[in-house]
């Protein structure tokens, strides 16, 4: 009887150990699966952040000439046109969620997207980018968008939230006369620093010094 009881007790203990081991194994498998999914998710996010973003093609400024009588004076830069394209392999970039930070002398301004009224269709060209009527809708804290290449219509089909995809080309339009009205725009020989910050991916640095003198209305800055 005692041997039988001991045998049954041992069997019960053995079964309990097997059950505990099975439960533990299930927990480990579940945890392992979660960690694997989490690692894959983090990896995808990291890849997206590294490859995504915008690159600057060129930056142009507009310094209009003001004529009074026989005297012509070249004003400060009153408008900026920043030509941008997505990085190679970038995820789509929503310009509605993009921010631009610019610092001129002691003034820093954060620009946000100005809405569908500040989006212009330039896919068929523009006679003079700085004289287009779209500038009338751009104030000192908003930026507009000139759409140059939009093969899949990702920007023009939804002007309220334009998305840039691979192969697209756009111009970010900034009214520097209103943004930096303290200086009447951007003066000659002035350092301009800033960043274009997309909703994901690395920010794009702006770092330039304007020419010592403005000899023409259209000035390539970067």
UniProtKB/Swiss-Prot annotation:
One Pfam family hit: Arch_flagellin
Keywords (A to Z) from UniProt: Archaeal flagellum
Propeptide residue span(s): 1-4
BP GO terms, sorted: archaeal or bacterial-type flagellum-dependent cell motility
Domain of life: Archaea
Cysteines paired by S-S bonds: none
InterPro entries for the chain: Flagellin/pilin_N_arc (IPR013373), Flagellin_arc (IPR002774)
Molecular function GO labels: structural molecule activity
Subcellular location(s) of the protein: Archaeal flagellum
Coiled-coil segments: none
GO CC terms, sorted: archaeal-type flagellum
Functional description taken from the UniProt entry: Flagellin is the subunit protein which polymerizes to form the filaments of archaeal flagella.
Sequence similarity: Belongs to the archaeal flagellin family.
NCBIfam families in alphabetical order: arch_flag_Nterm, PRK08541.1
Name listed for the protein in its UniProt record: Flagellin B5
Record organism: Pyrococcus abyssi (strain GE5 / Orsay)
Gene: flaB5
